[in-house]
Amino acid sequence: MSDFIFTSESVTEGHPDKICDQISDAVLDALLKEDPESRVACETVVNTGLCLLTGEITSRAKLDYIKLVRKVIKEIGYEGAKAGGFDSNSCAVLVALDEQSPDISQGVNEADDLNEDLENNTGAGDQGIMFGYACDETPELMPLPISLAHRLARQLAKVRHENVLEYLLPDGKTQVSIDYKKGVPVSINTILISTQHRAEIDGIINEKEIRQKITDDLWINVVLPVTEDLEIKPSKEKTRFLVNPTGKFVVGGPQGDAGLTGRKIIVDTYGGYARHGGGAFSGKDPTKVDRSAAYAARYVAKSIVKAKLAKKAEVQLSYAIGVAKPISILVDTFGTSVISQDNLKELIENNFDLRPAAIIKEFDLRNLPKKLGGEFYRKTASYGHFGRNDLNLPWESVEVKAAQLVEASKDFL
């Protein structure tokens, strides 16, 4: 099927699930800042007036978890009576954290199939499969639907934080449908934005009038600014633009829906455009291959596309708990590569060290929170972990590796 419509969604930082992702990653940042060897598997739950912090943590760091949770909730925008029914100052914060099981840690601490230096003897923290993807649809080598959905969600939050549209509240979602012809994006079919807002806007209380005002304001302040640099632009004549289709969105955030860490894994990755291994990222330290190996798989896929060895590349990695080397490596370029799949796999094996400790070292995943003032992973917890031009993410910096692949691939051309 070469002609189709593909749709991806994103959510703002005030979405209940994203509140949880940010809290879990804020805990991870704080622990790694004080103790880079911390083992963290932190889960968060939010509901009306409640935040629960749970999971397993082994660390020398000492944190005021309740204070940290309230800080994150406040910075998102949930503070005071006007914040949409969830208040950082008054919500209950419960902490129920345990230590990591010794049965898990013994397999992670030293893998049994390597005899090299101890640094590279770290086994995978769990079994699992991870996918990485890249394509040439956007400058950041991401699929256009998720790229644009993230742009819209970030801009929606920006105009709220900067009081450009002071009636907006923290919860919100975006969705973008792109028309493809012969597998290439050609136009923006539909843009959907659902955003929480105050019940009264500039003295307007009529539901229909409120929705029309929000629609007009979002087109001017959100849609147009984030699409001005795109080759494919929306138009009021050809692009369907939907805003709050149910009519109003006053009750939102944790007051409207419960939230949980790890429930937006498609938003975090490729918007459904590529396969997903099922593992979430937030709240997990770098020994968890759900996170670190997914970053590495993206690094490999993006390097391949950046090197122009393929227009699209999907890389699957699999691991076994306590074993350092990947159990399997698979690459699929969907018929777009200039060399064979077997040759691409050989290039990957010869140019990328995909053992967990090597990935951690390559990207400096344990030390980045401390180097960056105590906040790194939390910034990835909203608006995607990949294709982030607003963040300096090591797995997105592929120029050097792509050049290596160009040189190494000459033997196969």
UniProtKB/Swiss-Prot annotation:
Residues annotated as binding L-methionine: 56, 100, 257, 288
Location within or outside the cell: Cytoplasm
Protein name: S-adenosylmethionine synthase
Cofactor details (free text): Binds 2 divalent ions per subunit. Binds 1 potassium ion per subunit.
GO BP annotations listed: one-carbon metabolic process; S-adenosylmethionine biosynthetic process
Classification via SUPFAM superfamilies: S-adenosylmethionine synthetase (SSF55973)
UniProt cross-references to PANTHER family, sorted A to Z: S-ADENOSYLMETHIONINE SYNTHETASE
Top EC class of this enzyme: transferase
Chain positions covered by the region annotation Flexible loop: 100-110
Taxonomic lineage from the root: Bacteria, Bacillati, Cyanobacteriota, Cyanophyceae, Synechococcales
Pathway: Amino-acid biosynthesis; S-adenosyl-L-methionine biosynthesis; S-adenosyl-L-methionine from L-methionine: step 1/1
